[in-house]
Amino acid sequence: MAAPRWSASGPWIRGNGQGCGSLFTLVSKPFCAAAAASTAINAQRLAEKLRAQKREQDTKKEPVSTNAVQRRVQEIVRFTRQLQRVHPNVLAKALTRGILHQDKNLVVINKPYGLPVHGGPGVQLCITDVLPILAKMLHGHKAEPLHLCHRLDKETTGVMVLAWDKDMAHQVQELFRTRQVVKKYWAITVHVPMPSAGVVDIPIVEKEAQGQQQHHKMTLSPSYRMDDGKMVKVRRSRNAQVAVTQYQVLSSTLSSALVELQPITGIKHQLRVHLSFGLDCPILGDHKYSDWNRLAPQKLSVGTLKKLGLEQSKARYIPLHLHARQLILPALGSGKEELNLVCKLPRFFVHSLHRLRLEMPNEDQNENNEAKCLGAQ
């Protein structure tokens, strides 16, 4: 027979389903009679207590995080999901608050984290969907839709250029295609690139990764490989594309770095592949390219997790720390000067810099001060 358990109202006993007779072996008849006469303990109250106990047990199994960093990570996850569910007008209004530059030719916005540029499977809302609404908010109800000039990955934040008409969009797209636009990205890396500055010039190709889950990734397609200590030329894949990235370490510790990246070419996932597979320094929060064979949360060292204030089980929620920091466009139309566009870092990026003890260059002292304020919260 089950042992008695105690509730807020006294002892209750898990019987064997045989009726009141099973209780008489544990309690005296007077006590049993009194309990039967009492209306304080009834089936409804008992059921409520059982439900309350179950909720309490579930809470103990999955405690709510009180860690400030983990709360911020959870907020980013919730925010990213909300972006896919808000009304297009709400999203367009949010984008107007992040406008970096606006003139008769262009509108430059600060692209938020987790927002896709184009539609696709599973995408409920993207930037392309709200371009007509955004144009009307800026130029009135008769305004024609804005046009995309280039793209950024869903997880990448920062400078994004839109044009008021198709001709201007094509002009800017041609500048990107002919590599006349200077693009600078900032990334936080796991490990420190060696040497601290250089150029990665390794072609990239898309391949199928063989693992528990079959999936496709971009990867390196080098022209040479080492064979018994000798450098041997490799036959180039016909699908490989030339990919060149210039990089410089801006700040570093023993286990992480703030790196400025200047892609000379514009191949899909170029920066992520060159950092992870070329320099063995994956971007913090890159859960796709931190391991070739697996699609799994990024594995971080105990020291890095401790600095970030996270457990490994929460690493899956770390956002990709890749930010389109700056674009320099040549003079457009009747303009005589180049257009230098700089975008402030997102708050989660700034906070991670502070937690990892990474310093920003002196000219970015205001954002550095913001990092310290966030860390003190």
From Swiss-Prot:
Q: What keywords sit in the KW lines?
A: Coiled coil, Cytoplasm, Isomerase, Mitochondrion, mRNA processing, mRNA splicing, Nucleus, rRNA processing, Transit peptide, tRNA processing
Identify which top EC class this enzyme belongs to.
Answer: isomerase
Q: Gene Ontology terms, cellular component aspect?
A: mitochondrial matrix; mitochondrion; nucleoplasm; ribonucleoprotein granule
| Free-text function comment from the UniProt entry | Catalyzes uridine to pseudouridine isomerization (pseudouridylation) of different mitochondrial RNA substrates. Acts on position 1397 in 16S mitochondrial ribosomal RNA (16S mt-rRNA). This modification is required for the assembly of 16S mt-rRNA into a functional mitochondrial ribosome. As a component of a functional protein-RNA module, consisting of RCC1L, NGRN, RPUSD3, RPUSD4, TRUB2, FASTKD2 and 16S mt-rRNA, controls 16S mt-rRNA abundance and is required for intra-mitochondrial translation. Acts on position 39 in mitochondrial tRNA(Phe).
**Organism expressing this protein natively:** Homo sapiens
The UniProt subunit note reads as follows: Interacts with 16S mt-rRNA, mt-tRNA(Phe) and mt-tRNA(Met). Forms a regulatory protein-RNA complex, consisting of RCC1L, NGRN, RPUSD3, RPUSD4, TRUB2, FASTKD2 and 16S mt-rRNA.
Give a Pfam family name: PseudoU_synth_2
This chain belongs to the protein called: Pseudouridylate synthase RPUSD4, mitochondrial
What is this enzyme's EC?
A: 5.4.99.-
Spell out the coiled coil positions from the record.
36-62
Active site at: D153
Q: Name one GO molecular function term.
A: pseudouridine synthase activity
Recorded hits in SUPFAM superfamilies, A to Z, give: Pseudouridine synthase (SSF55120)
Q: Into which family does the record put it?
A: Belongs to the pseudouridine synthase RluA family.
Q: Which reaction does it catalyse?
A: uridine in 5S rRNA = pseudouridine in 5S rRNA; a uridine in tRNA = a pseudouridine in tRNA; a uridine in mRNA = a pseudouridine in mRNA
Q: Where is the transit peptide?
A: 1-15
Subcellular compartments: Mitochondrion matrix; Nucleus; Cytoplasm
GO biological processes: mitochondrial tRNA pseudouridine synthesis; mRNA processing; mRNA pseudouridine synthesis; positive regulation of mitochondrial translation; RNA splicing; rRNA pseudouridine synthesis
